[in-house]
Amino acid sequence: MAEITSAKAMARTVRVSPRKTRLVLDLIRGKNVADAIAILKFTPNKAARIVEKTLNSAVANAENNFGLEKANLVVSETFANEGPTMKRFRPRAKGSASPINKRTTHVTVVVEEK
């Protein structure tokens, strides 16, 4: 049986738009875990907090479930897929209304031993 060298964590239905989350994920893809966490700490963005939490969860999964070393881990894959959209309406003049889409995201972070 092949040895497991990667671990994954997901955050589902997070109240941040996927487009904004992808901007943050592009910053950390391919970096080692320590650098990625440092980058996320100094990114002034709601999505950065969520991605940081998910990354820490993936690292914990790697250490506890698969016995991998934190120092050897690299962020190999990150993606943000669209979750369910909450549809709301904003009242406008003359009895009309404009739609508001409150988007959610499914964030996935995969760490791999280099």
From Swiss-Prot:
The UniProt record lists the keyword Ribonucleoprotein: yes
Domain of life: Bacteria
UniProt keywords, alphabetically: Ribonucleoprotein, Ribosomal protein, RNA-binding, rRNA-binding
Annotated Pfam families: Ribosomal_L22 (PF00237)
GO term, biological process aspect, one: translation
UniProt-listed InterPro entries: Ribosomal_uL22, Ribosomal_uL22_bac/chlpt-type, Ribosomal_uL22_bac/org-type, Ribosomal_uL22_CS, Ribosomal_uL22_sf
Keyword Ribosomal protein: yes
GO molecular function: rRNA binding; structural constituent of ribosome
Transmembrane regions listed in the UniProt entry: none
GO annotations of cellular component type: cytosolic large ribosomal subunit
UniProt subunit comment: Part of the 50S ribosomal subunit.
Role according to the record: This protein binds specifically to 23S rRNA; its binding is stimulated by other ribosomal proteins, e.g. L4, L17, and L20. It is important during the early stages of 50S assembly. It makes multiple contacts with different domains of the 23S rRNA in the assembled 50S subunit and ribosome. The globular domain of the protein is located near the polypeptide exit tunnel on the outside of the subunit, while an extended beta-hairpin is found that lines the wall of the exit tunnel in the center of the 70S ribosome.
Similarity comment: family membership: Belongs to the universal ribosomal protein uL22 family.
Protein name per Swiss-Prot or TrEMBL: Large ribosomal subunit protein uL22
Organism: Streptococcus mutans serotype c (strain ATCC 700610 / UA159)
Gene of this entry: rplV
